């Protein structure tokens, strides 16, 4: 447990950590095929819950020790190579480029990140070049996935028999042959309506035999059928197993193949180190209309410019394409994709007509033909991302010996992400999942971009006195900036369907819609941390951070967030030295206060939207369309920090030469 772990603005021996921390190593990431960094944490970090919707390229929701906020965001902070990044940036990182991940869980560990760390912190360290010969590595994998339904679905015959029996049990069955199947009654009453939807008639009739005059072939009912089941003496010949069952889920699924390839280079000397990689991911979904592709380029370099100055820079470039086909977030109770649509369709609803063509009726059980809608719906999102992390570190002890143990470090990081979301729904799209519009040939083209940068200046002081006192001091100042802007266009009755969302101008412009958005926010912070160790047994960590956020009200922008933690290395005490099988035993307790400012940047001042002022002051309609404005968000001059105070008590242990380790 003496391995070094990242703790936020520095590193520590794992045995000296006073807060709640879980580490996920490179070895753990390689143990199973993962497409993003968050999947590597799943099931490997206690107290971390990851909920995914299984769409390729989706990150899912991460919760560290549950939710902390009622209305604001509960997402953790992601820090990549010391630079805070947005949650979406995790999709742009190739998991094979990750050296380690540390999850900070309690307030005493996360308080060093102030308001940004209120929901926990995920620290990611990417690979760096290593001293030695140039090494070139290739990693490639291919995996398969399918959807294995745990539900034993009824076939068509079982469903109609069940419907009929439920009516018999309710004394509501009205067949001419007692309780026996009746082709003149059942087709309309229990089979979706063969009179109203003629395409169902051949499917339903397959369970019966008919004479040349169209009447059903009859047979003698058995004594059991007459006395127990309530059949008439003569009943139609009937076999429900002959009713075809449409394999809707088979139509929309497949055995998905995922390819993952990476080529990396590592090189280094005592003065410089270099790591670079090229990676390609091609992930199919078991649903035929979904897939994901990602291309990444990663470059990390460090140079020991002089004995006292080290500089480094990392650049990550990414491009990804997500195709989602039929997808909806309309409500929490409806189907969300083509597979959900398929499970909602009746098993007796045919996908093809008698000529083998796709059915596209205007109503009835086959109206939302899954095969037809897959062909009519396209949803594609393209991302272009760039992340920069850089640092310069000055060791004053190498300049003047009395200053040994004092270092200055400046970090600068930036992130740019551009997204284009294109959606197109053709003329035969049947709106199966509750979309807002049922207009024909609808196209959406949404563009958004995000820019963020972070600047941090830090001073580190590490001193040891009389061999038993170890003192560490960290002082930091940081500034952060975030900017987002977007534009969206909606077009109806597009003239060129093959142009998808690239020709929205050729549409019914009287129905077109356009919107745009912009927001920016700033944060500033000052932080101090003290680490003290007595005889390498008794540990104290004190942290204080002064945070300011532009999103909050004028008088509430700044606040102070403290934390404290104590730890006792019981295994270092003399009374345990004779017990050889106990290698690590540490008891820790921590308390901290964190803040959350994840609110709309303009909520304190309110927001205005334009609106036709046709009915001002309840005076009735005005003949001219006069443009007015109304408040969409009421101003809140008292909006301040949402604070969470928490206490954590834990124990870390390692037994039998640390073959058995754990935390509680």
Predicted regions and their residues:
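Short, small/polar-rich motifs associated with maturation and membrane association
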Residues: 1-284, 288-298, 310-312, 359, ...
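Extracellular/periplasmic, surface-exposed regions of secreted and cell-surface proteins
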Residues: 2-3, 29-34, 38, 55, ...
